[in-house]
Amino acid sequence: MLKTVAIQVQGRVQGVGFRPFVYTLAQEMGLNGWVNNSTQGATVVITADEKAIADFTERLTKTLPPPGLIEQLAVEQLPLESFTNFTIRPSSDGPKTASILPDLSTCSACLTELFDPSDRRYLYPFINCTHCGPRYTIIEALPYDRCRTTMARFRQCTDCEREYKQPGDRRFHAQPNACPRCGPQLAFWNRQGQVIAEANEALNFAVDNLKVGNIIAIKGLGGFHLCCDATDFEAVEKLRLRKHRPDKPLAVMYGNLGQIVEHYQPNNLEVELLQSAAAPIVLLNKKKQLILVENIAPGNPRVGVMLAYTPLHHLLLKKLKKPMVATSGNLAGEQICIDNIDALTRLQNIADGFLVHDRPIVCPVDDSVVQIVAGKPLFLRRARGYAPQPITLPKPTQKKLLAMGGHYKNTVAIAKQNQAYVSQHLGDLNSAPTYQNFEEAIAHLSQLYDFSPQEIVADLHPDYFSHQYAENQALPVTFVQHHYAHILAVMAEHGVMEESVLGIAWDGTGYGMDGTIWGGEFLKITQGTWQRIAHLQPFHLLGNQQAIKYPHRIALALLWPTFGDDFSADSLGNWLNFNNGFKNKINSRLNQDLNNKNLRQLWQRGQAPLTSSMGRLFDGIATLIGLINEVTFEGQAAIALEAQIMPNLTEEYYPLTLNNKEKKLAVDWRPLIKAITTEDRSKTNLIATKFHNSLVNLIITIAQQQGIEKVALGGGCFQNCYLLASTITALKKAGFSPLWPRELPPNDGAICMGQLLAKIQARQYIC
């Protein structure tokens, strides 16, 4: 018996060729009806008998090619209706919950056409199809149709329109479809904004500039990159000098996988990530014969590497025949530029020229950064290729919620029904441009999903801009402790929100429930409560933020409590004076400040903030053994310390003792400091390895004391590959179930998600 049904499909079904796929499937099966995009996903209506409908829905779910993904499918019977064929209908309006697809790297079919002299899109830098190209960064509103994207201003030529309307064509309903006759165009500008060249000549001009050591600002998918020849030491040094980025590693883009395999040691999973539709930056171990100059990632055994992911990048690198540095096109501490004129204004003193195009970018989206730990991808930055794909909540929210995230590595999130939409990485909220980007990201997500929050969730820290922004809105606000949010984000990913969990949240900073700076936390979370059961014994930040910039001050705050009030520069004698040029710089600072009466008085009188931060302990140890003099980017000292590890060198560790303090365990680091100062200070590999082993042993000790099977690991310290992998291995060996982030980063990029979860599933804090 015939019946008519409506199949409501939710998931990644817009911008992936879903409607053409459904059309072709219906044609193959001889079914009549229609399909369209809706603001919630897609709707398919067919009239057929029960078996045909069942076969159709099965094939729909099982044969949809990636990156399409059906997350929910509901079949509803309608009044019987007769159709004479199967059609694609115009999009319909309604509540906006459809998944927005991230931008996709260029597919192999488009690459073949790009370099085919007989193809009409030969060397066209904006070639795309239903399987690749811009999505999130061109979408202005839902549902996803050309008229609601920045491609609306480019009217398709006759040939493009024919492809767009031809059901069997790869560009059937490809919204960014274009060609050299009707689509976006390139131009090369000098520093004054004068057009020097256009179209292919602009590309040639950019390559010629890169070859002679110039820095070029290149407009890509989600914003501008600052690019230079990655094999030219002087060019890289010039970029660092102009961008005020003396030490932070730079990302490198390659034209093909063969070049990467020649100079790095990627495993199968890393290769899969590099070649995926998301095409993130992947951290790879160097080979000895690496052709890159050392100032790409000074002192670091790994480099952030990505493959060309747009046609423009492929064309550039094909002509350049070398890898190029591709770092975010911004000033230090600001968001990346997306507008041509804004880029000219802000990057004028960095770039020697500008390769621009006239396809507007709706919102800035940085490159994602991923590394492999314990055989799984671990995000360091979730942005292009992944955001803003929705994350299913463990249970629906009764109200529409807006989560503000933290202050560093900020992301924001909105929640409605059972879905959370986490923004792309927005950066540190330290400047007016990043505040503006933060506000625009909230406005953009709200517009896309027709979202008006009923309540706000924010970080507990009163000085955070995100906290203050929340307070200034005329809405109820719930403030959530930072490290609690870290652990909730991990728990939700693993579906253990109703279970008891030992949470270990280690990072650089977070406002504690007692008003001090936390960061080395052990949290016990049950179904109805959460409490701080252990923490690193607090130490002073001498000079507050100055201690973070100059971590020898942290070293002092560790040495004085360890060796006593009369400890001075002479106390460790030859140990501090190990003869090494760079270390002598650090030693001179240590020696000078060990005798600094003002700093000593700050410590003696307790006139400096206390912190239990594990991240700051890393800083102090790195300085103590002579690895770092001045911190110029977040995590620099910890990265330097991790780089010294030799994984198979030793299983030994330094002692850490646990003291009962006010019903909590305080982790006393003084025995560790004493033990380190008895080592040969030149053996930094040994000290770094034993230090990390000490932390793993600490986790196992407290886990065994608590006896909670599931142990969640969160916070920026768990970006450390050795620490995370060793902890996972040790926990499993000891009979525990380690939980660590998969969908979101361990750093503050996950805080907004944890905030949502704290509001949806309230727990009482036990002092």
From Swiss-Prot:
Q: Which UniProt keywords apply?
A: Ligase, Metal-binding, Zinc, Zinc-finger
Stretches annotated zinc finger (C4-type): 107-132, 157-182
Keyword Secreted (UniProt) = no
| Enzyme Commission identifier(s) | 6.2.-.-
Single GO MF annotation: carboxyl- or carbamoyltransferase activity
- Metabolic or biological pathway: Protein modification; [NiFe] hydrogenase maturation
Indicate the enzyme's highest-level EC class.
ligase
YrdC-like domain location is 200-385
The text of the family note is: Belongs to the carbamoyltransferase HypF family.
Q: What does this protein do?
A: Involved in the maturation of [NiFe] hydrogenases. Along with HypE, it catalyzes the synthesis of the CN ligands of the active site iron of [NiFe]-hydrogenases. HypF functions as a carbamoyl transferase using carbamoylphosphate as a substrate and transferring the carboxamido moiety in an ATP-dependent reaction to the thiolate of the C-terminal cysteine of HypE yielding a protein-S-carboxamide.
Know the name of this protein?
Answer: Carbamoyltransferase HypF
Q: Name the source organism.
A: Synechocystis sp. (strain ATCC 27184 / PCC 6803 / Kazusa)
